[in-house]
Amino acid sequence: MPHAVIGACGDFLFGFRRLLMNALNLSTAVSITHNALAVGRELRAAPLTVAVLDAGGHLITLQREDGASLLRPQIAIGKAWGALALGKGSRLIAADAQQRPAFIGAVNNLAQGSLVPAPGGVLIRDAQGQVIGAVGITGDTSDIDEQCAVSALESLGLKADAGV
């Protein structure tokens, strides 16, 4: 019996260590934000707001450029949070909103209005394809927002899942 318990504990700790190694940390989140804003400047985008959330939907970092409008932080968080909540990039959520508005409306009610069904919310996947977080960007057109997110993630060797 003690060997079985020790084995189970060892398996748990190995899994927990693997989870921590694949978790999104502050340094990486700040790099994602920095790179996304740099891409936005290269594209001459309107002032952007970038939010990075961990896999549990918790905000790690948020940056809002000078000139970004009032609700941009909530929109960026809503794009990233929606991607995490539904397990797909917000481009697919936007398509769902067009094809199944009652469903997305119901989900948004359950989410207390936190879901933003527009491109710019991109899942962040590790090398094994597991979701480790999401980035949400807003400020320019949804296509530009999404392009900044994808480029930032790819520049760091992360897998971007925009739902395309």
Role assignments for model-derived ranges:
Residues 19-164:
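Flexible, solvent-exposed loop/hinge segments and secondary-structure transition points
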